[in-house]
């Protein structure tokens, strides 16, 4: 046991002893639930922060606050609520009473205070403690500071502690809530209907990913947590709902990284009588308006860069992007789609770039992997990458001029993918063939290949109108709006490896 742990255990024991005293001498077993908090710290600061000491004394303003004790400075307590901080003043008689009733207050305790509002000699607003209650006794002490790797782990494992002591974390999650609300409002104004589709699927589909598997006892069948809502949302478009969207969780049984969490939030939407160009236009409008609404400007700081959401956004094909960011590679500079279709040529090119090549990779997979290896991280400004090969886009419509590629894009900012969209494949027979190719790929060892979904083929046979659809990764988007560089900083309770003990 470390010295720090011994000290913490001693403090916890002291606080437990105080709680026993409180239970004996205070009503409600030391946990009252009848305090009427009427005011918030930030509202008080905004309304009276400009008044002088004399003005406040003449006004006789009474305020009722509640929150957590974050600091003790002589007779002053710093009280924190959801909106901010304000001080409370405990005179000598109050301090004596606090000692008798509660054996004194500790940092972390939650209290309610009612009294006159005053201004201290240092110019800080405070509420005089005329009426007060200890609402919750904190048994564990708060950490003094968060720094270093160990404390990073604590931030994620004990997010409740992080939110108490770390204002930046609180602000990040407040911004997350605002981003989600702004997206929802934007979609509703564009006449999209919000829907909810199943979270458990009998056949996982809508993306290339490993699913989480479970078992439904009553039906005695295997079920999968959804990897994407796409196929259900398109069934709704078949049914006549021409504009639908869903903001919800997806689950993918894959690794952890600064960009990946096994459960994550997506906003996925579909619009009939539109194509992938319409999606790109809508995405520009959405992100530009949301950035301006929430941040006052379409230009946001991100690390050493400034990301400009104002538009227009760059648009280039995957092949052109590879050429752009490999200017000194003669083979890449002269590469054509005919060569991209040659799997041996692509395998040799990937190996020449120092890449490890899986035996089941197709031409399209090789092109995408080369793009990811050499170009993706260069895309700091908002950029639409188009020209995705059909063999890695099993749900997207083929391009009319070049059947090797599809009318699909992925949207990149800050060197990472944030969204994926395309003109939907509504040819039931073509979709049937592509599903079968995915089954063959799975048999060849690609465990992220899709399953065959016969009911979805049946839905397409009823007729899907020309449709475009897109998914936006909410977590990665929020990372940009909060200038954070790991997905764990924008997910309240991220997945963590089990602790040794």
Swiss-Prot record:
User: Where found?
Assistant: Cytoplasm
Does the record bear Protein biosynthesis in its keywords?
yes
Q: How is the cofactor bound?
A: Binds 3 Mg(2+) ions per subunit.
**Named cofactor requirement(s):** Mg(2+)
Q: So where does Mg(2+) 1 get bound?
A: 410, 417
Chief subcellular location equals cytoplasm
| GO MF, any single term | magnesium ion binding
Q: Which residues form a coiled coil?
A: none
Per the record, what are the reactions this protein catalyses?
Answer: tRNA(Lys) + L-lysine + ATP = L-lysyl-tRNA(Lys) + AMP + diphosphate
Task: Identify the residues that bind Mg(2+) 2.
Answer: 417
Q: Which UniProt keywords apply?
A: Aminoacyl-tRNA synthetase, ATP-binding, Cytoplasm, Ligase, Magnesium, Metal-binding, Nucleotide-binding, Protein biosynthesis
Write down the superkingdom of origin. Answer: Bacteria
> Pfam families this protein is in?
tRNA-synt_2 (PF00152), tRNA_anti-codon (PF01336)
Q: Name one GO cellular component term.
A: cytosol
Q: What class of enzyme is it?
A: ligase
Question: Subunit comment for this entry?
Answer: Homodimer.
Family membership, please give it.
Belongs to the class-II aminoacyl-tRNA synthetase family.
Identify this protein by name: Lysine--tRNA ligase
Look up and give the organism this protein is from: Shewanella pealeana (strain ATCC 700345 / ANG-SQ1)
């Amino acid at each position: 046991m470390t010295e720090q742990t011994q000290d913490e255990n001693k403090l916890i024991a002291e606080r437990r002893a105080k709680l026993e005293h409180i239970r004996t001498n205070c009503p409600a077993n030391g946990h009252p639930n009848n305090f009427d908090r009427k005011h918030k710290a930030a509202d008080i600061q905004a309304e009276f922060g400009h008044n002088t000491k004399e003005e406040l004394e003449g006004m006789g303003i009474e305020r009722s606050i509640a929150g957590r004790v974050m600091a003790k400075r002589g007779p002053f307590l710093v009280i924190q609520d959801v909106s901010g901080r304000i001080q409370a003043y405990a005179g000598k008689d109050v301090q004596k009473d606090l000692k008798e009733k509660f054996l004194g207050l500790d940092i972390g305790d939650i209290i309610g205070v009612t009294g006159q509002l005053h201004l201290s000699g240092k110019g800080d607003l405070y509420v005089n403690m005329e009426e007060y209650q200890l609402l919750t006794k904190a048994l564990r002490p708060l950490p003094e500071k968060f720094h270093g790797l160990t404390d990073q782990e604590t931030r994620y494992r004990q997010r409740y502690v992080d939110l108490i002591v770390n204002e930046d974390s609180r602000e990040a999650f407040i911004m997350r809530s605002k981003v989600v609300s702004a997206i929802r409002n934007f979609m509703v104004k564009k006449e999209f209907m919000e829907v909810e589709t199943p979270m458990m699927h009998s056949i996982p589909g809508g993306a290339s990913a490993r699913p989480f598997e479970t078992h439904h006892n009553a039906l005695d069948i295997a079920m999968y947590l959804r990897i994407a809502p796409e196929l259900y949302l398109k069934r709704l478009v078949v049914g006549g709902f021409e504009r639908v969207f869903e903001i919800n969780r997806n689950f993918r049984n894959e690794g952890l990284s600064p960009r990946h969490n096994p459960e994550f939030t997506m906003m996925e939407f579909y619009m009939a009588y539109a194509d992938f160009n319409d999606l790109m236009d809508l995405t520009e409008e959405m992100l530009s308006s949301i950035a301006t609404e929430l941040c006052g400007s379409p230009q946001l700081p991100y690390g050493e860069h400034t990301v400009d959401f104002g538009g227009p956004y760059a648009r280039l094909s995957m092949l052109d992007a590879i050429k752009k960011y490999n200017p000194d590679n003669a083979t890449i500079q002269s590469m054509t789609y005919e060569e991209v279709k040659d799997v041996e040529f692509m395998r040799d090119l990937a190996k020449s770039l120092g890449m490890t090549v899986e035996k089941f990779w197709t031409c399209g997979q090789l092109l995408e992997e080369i793009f990811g290896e050499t170009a993706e991280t260069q895309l700091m400004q908002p950029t639409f990458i188009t020209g995705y090969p059909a063999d890695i886009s099993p749900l997207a419509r083929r391009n009319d001029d070049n059947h090797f590629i599809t009318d699909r894009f992925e949207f990149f900012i800050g060197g990472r993918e944030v969204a994926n969209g395309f003109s939907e494949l509504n040819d039931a027979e073509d979709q049937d063939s592509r599903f079968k190719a995915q089954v063959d790929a799975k048999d060849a060892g690609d465990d992220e290949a899709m399953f065959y979904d016969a009911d979805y083929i049946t839905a397409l046979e009823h007729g899907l109108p020309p449709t475009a659809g897109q998914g936006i990764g909410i977590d990665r988007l929020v990372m940009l709006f909060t200038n954070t560089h790991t997905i764990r900083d924008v997910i309240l309770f991220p997945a963590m490896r089990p602790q040794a003990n």
